[in-house]
Amino acid sequence: LFKELIKKFDNIDFEKIKNKVETKKIIFICGMPRSGTTLVEQILSSHPEVYGAGELLYLENSINKNFLENNIINRQKIIDLQSSSSENVFLDYFKCFDIYNLDKNIITDKTPQNFKWIGFIKIFFPNAKIILCQRNPKDNCVSLFKNDFPALTMNWSFDQEEIAEYYNEYHKLISFWKDKIPKDIYQLNYER
């Protein structure tokens, strides 16, 4: 999937995407699992204007439903995103917070795996901030191996070789996003 994302988003010009008027600001906190996303969200949500929403699955579910078929991305649908379908996802995402009756203006979504969807994030939410949590690769991979994650979503985390392969593909994808939209990604190093 990572190579597929790079291939499909390579020719997208994110500078041409119109900014939407957002009633609430959103900060996406992402990175490899066990890279510090929870800690970053806890620090940010201690501010009175920030609501820490935790790991939301809405974005990934919406992308899987509307843009992926057997882990293959429909490029035409990405191109069409600049039409009303993008607006619908944008509005629906914020509607999921209506049940909370929030008086806070900033919302965080700390789903680590959202690093895969940074291209979609910049189309759906051009004004969103993205914090990419980075950790020493060896420490991150050992921590992944020592934890018991759900096999359905992270079956690669049970084997050291698969973890290394996944991390390498992650690193290539992150390098692509940072080259493609450098001013929109803030990299936060766990050890600093």
Identify the function of each model-found stretch.
Residues 1-101:
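Alpha-helical solenoid repeat scaffolds of the TPR/TPR-like class and their adjacent stem/linker regions
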Residues 53, 58-80, 100-192:
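PAPS-dependent sulfotransferase catalytic domain
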